[in-house]
């Protein structure tokens, strides 16, 4: 609400809704299949990753890794899924010149029989990512990235469909070790991902 007040944007129905309230609910017909309305804390599912560098050179590198997710969290409060998931990933980068770099990644995951919307869960999910980075000058680099992923759930609605997102952004570095990340993402396959997202971050290397 502070953001809306700062830029004099309309507040919609927010003033009539409870403050600091949480409600995650999925209903079909008269049945409520998922409902979380209280905060929770605790141990989440634990991912264990095993990686291997396939190739590496001055021009680029390729690596692969296997990830196993162990169900240490609780499905009831969404800190876990209640199942073991296994994913295989392959990632690479290629330096075309001093200023241009290509990168990409492919992932496929086998999803175990979980406890969160089990009847709607898919058995497999996949994702692809590809992009290019241009070193505009010594302190500034600009990146364009395209990412797509298949649906994890199948509820018959567009909200949980396959997603395709285009991201544009960059990073500015200072001599003192600070780095500023900025960018935005836009959904190319509508309904299954946020319409537009703005990103800004600051970090410092020590």
How should each PLM-predicted stretch be described?
Residues 1-113, 117-206:
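Transmembrane beta-barrel domains of Gram-negative outer membranes and organellar outer membranes
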